[in-house]
C-alpha cells in the first residue's frame, strides 16, 4: 500500500477526538477496511470541516467529513476560503443532518431577536459555527457587534451556560448533542427557534440551510 494514500491506504479526516465526527468516522473507517476488498481506511483526528478540506487539497488525506455550508465556501472561494477557491473534490455521501441549535438557560430568551445585548457564544472565530451564527443573526438584522460575543467550543459553552457566565450559545451538531444533554441534566435548558418569516429570509441568502424541527423530548 502507499503511504501517500494513492493506492489502497486512505486517510479519513474526521474531527476532534471527543466529537461525533471522530467516533462516527472511526466506525466507518473500520467498516470500509473490513469490507473494502483490500482498501485500508484510517480515521484521523482533525480540527473539523475547514481543516479537512485543506488537508485533502494537499493530499494529506483522501476522505473527510465536511459540513455542506463549509463545502459551499470552499467551492465558491468565500468566507473561510476567501480568495482561495477549492473545487477539486466530490461528494461521496450525505450522512446526516446537523442542526444549528441555539441554547439558553434563560426562559425569557424566546427569539433570536432577544439575543441583542446578551452574552452569546458563537463558536471559534472563523469556524463553521461562527458563520452559522452570523447568518442567523443577520436574518434578524443583528450583527456580531449587537451581542457580547464569546468564542467557545461546545463543552466550554455548556459549562459557561451552567455557571451563568453567558446567556446563550450556538451549537452546530446532530441532536441530541452530548454537551446539551449534560447541561440539561443540571439546569433547565431551552432551545430557541426561528419563525417562518426569518427562516425564509435565511434561506434566501444562504440556500444550504433547511428547516428542521428538533423532536420534543430530545433533551429529556
Walk through the language-model features, giving the residues of each:
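Bilobed "Venus flytrap"/periplasmic-binding protein-like clamshell domains
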Residues: 7-35, 39-40, 97-163
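Pocket-lining segment of extracytoplasmic ligand-binding domains
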Residues: 68-70, 78-79, 144-220
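A structural signal for short loop-to-beta-strand junctions that line the ligand-binding cleft
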Residues: 82-95, 218-220
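Extracytoplasmic
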Residues: 7, 36-38, 48-51, 58, ...
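N-terminal Sec signal peptide cleavage junction
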Residues: 1-2
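Pocket-flanking alpha-helical
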Residues: 29-30, 42-83, 102, 155-160, ...
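Residues that cap or initiate secondary-structure elements
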Residues: 18, 49, 69-70, 108, ...
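Loop/turn elements at helix/coil->beta-strand transitions in domains of secreted/extracellular proteins
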Residues: 37-39, 60-62, 87, 117-118, ...
Amino acid at each position: 500500500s502507499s503511504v501517500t494514500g494513492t493506492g489502497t491506504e486512505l486517510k479519513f479526516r474526521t474531527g476532534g477526538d471527543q466529537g461525533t465526527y471522530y467516533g462516527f468516522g472511526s466506525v466507518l473507517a473500520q467498516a470500509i477496511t473490513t469490507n473494502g476488498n483490500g482498501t485500508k481506511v484510517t480515521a484521523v483526528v482533525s480540527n473539523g470541516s475547514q481543516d479537512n478540506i485543506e488537508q485533502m487539497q494537499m493530499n494529506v488525506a483522501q476522505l473527510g467529513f465536511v459540513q455542506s455550508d463549509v463545502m459551499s465556501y470552499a467551492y465558491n472561494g468565500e468566507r473561510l476560503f476567501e480568495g482561495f477557491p477549492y473545487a477539486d473534490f466530490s461528494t461521496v455521501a450525505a450522512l446526516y443532518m446537523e442542526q444549528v441549535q441555539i441554547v439558553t438557560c434563560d426562559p425569557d430568551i424566546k427569539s433570536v431577536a432577544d439575543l441583542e445585548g446578551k452574552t452569546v457564544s458563537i463558536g471559534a472565530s472563523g469556524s463553521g459555527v461562527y458563520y452559522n451564527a452570523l447568518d442567523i443573526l443577520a436574518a434578524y438584522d443583528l450583527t456580531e457587534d449587537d451581542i457580547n460575543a464569546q468564542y467557545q467550543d461546545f463543552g466550554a459553552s455548556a459549562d459557561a451556560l451552567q455557571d451563568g457566565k453567558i446567556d446563550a450559545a450556538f451549537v452546530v451538531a446532530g441532536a441530541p448533542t452530548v454537551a446539551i444533554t449534560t447541561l440539561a441534566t443540571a439546569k433547565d435548558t431551552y432551545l430557541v427557534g426561528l419563525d417562518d418569516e426569518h427562516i425564509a429570509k435565511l434561506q434566501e441568502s444562504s440556500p444550504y440551510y433547511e428547516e428542521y424541527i428538533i423532536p420534543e423530548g430530545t433533551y429529556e
